[in-house]
Amino acid sequence: MLILAGLGNPEPKYEKNRHNVGFMAVDALARKWGTAPWRARFQGLACEGQVSTPDGPVKLLLLKPKTYYNESGRAVGEAMKFFKLQPTDVIVFHDEIDMAPGRFRMKSGGGAAGNNGIRSVTSQVGDAFRRGRIGVGHPGHKDAVMHYVLGDFHKVEHQWLDPILDAIADALPFAAVGDDERYQAEVMRLAPAPKADPRKPAKDD
């Protein structure tokens, strides 16, 4: 079994924020692989699912914590303990400001790199869980980061956002059998990152 958790904030006003791209990824995964409706569980909204792999079906728990971004670990830890899973059975999808828009990287272990949601998960389950990092770009100055991540994606950003969310769902069978490197490569093959940040106008030659 795998827990696929997204980082985000639960209120409707945050729904389209860059900080909620983890929730968006889990929603895409649920549309593709979910087998039951969302319901309140584990201090969040949870949905059961199943993904087909060459090694047979793998059960899924899709999870959107309602604890707010910075306390996401409480929900993830509760679900992991309930199902008696290991941290390596958990993938947490989240926004990554230190990656260009539309990039996707899998990572296992390591520090939180200033991400309070990841720090919260680490405090509950240790640092061996897997992370699906979705690049949203950086506003250019650290004082602008909070306003930036709590801002909605611009219309032009959906040129890369919508395809990468679909790819994260479509390529999941590779992650379900533990091949995170192949999963990452397949997501980027299905949804290549833009060559330039679509938020910024192209410079004249």
UniProtKB/Swiss-Prot annotation:
Residues marked Discriminates between blocked and unblocked aminoacyl-tRNA (site): 9
Name its species. Answer: Caulobacter vibrioides (strain NA1000 / CB15N)
Described function: Hydrolyzes ribosome-free peptidyl-tRNAs (with 1 or more amino acids incorporated), which drop off the ribosome during protein synthesis, or as a result of ribosome stalling. Catalyzes the release of premature peptidyl moieties from peptidyl-tRNA molecules trapped in stalled 50S ribosomal subunits, and thus maintains levels of free tRNAs and 50S ribosomes.
**Organism lineage:** Bacteria, Pseudomonadati, Pseudomonadota, Alphaproteobacteria, Caulobacterales
Major subcellular site:
cytoplasm
Pfam families per the UniProt record, alphabetical = Pept_tRNA_hydro
Instruction: Return the NCBIfam families for the record.
Output: pth
Residue numbers marked as site, Stabilizes the basic form of H active site to accept a proton: 95
Give its E.C. classification number.
Answer: 3.1.1.29
One GO cellular component term noted in the UniProt record for this chain: cytoplasm
Instruction: Report any one BP term from Gene Ontology.
Output: protein quality control for misfolded or incompletely synthesized proteins
Keyword set, alphabetical order: Cytoplasm, Hydrolase, RNA-binding, tRNA-binding
Which terms does the record give in the GO molecular function aspect? peptidyl-tRNA hydrolase activity; tRNA binding
Q: Cite the binding residues for tRNA.
A: 14, 68, 70, 116
Which catalytic reaction applies to this protein? an N-acyl-L-alpha-aminoacyl-tRNA + H2O = an N-acyl-L-amino acid + a tRNA + H(+)
Task: Please state what the protein is called.
Answer: Peptidyl-tRNA hydrolase
Its localization reads: Cytoplasm
Annotated active site = 19 (proton acceptor)
Q: How does it assemble?
A: Monomer.
PANTHER family xrefs: PEPTIDYL-TRNA HYDROLASE
Q: Which family does it belong to?
A: Belongs to the PTH family.
The record's section on Gene3D superfamilies has: Peptidyl-tRNA hydrolase (3.40.50.1470)
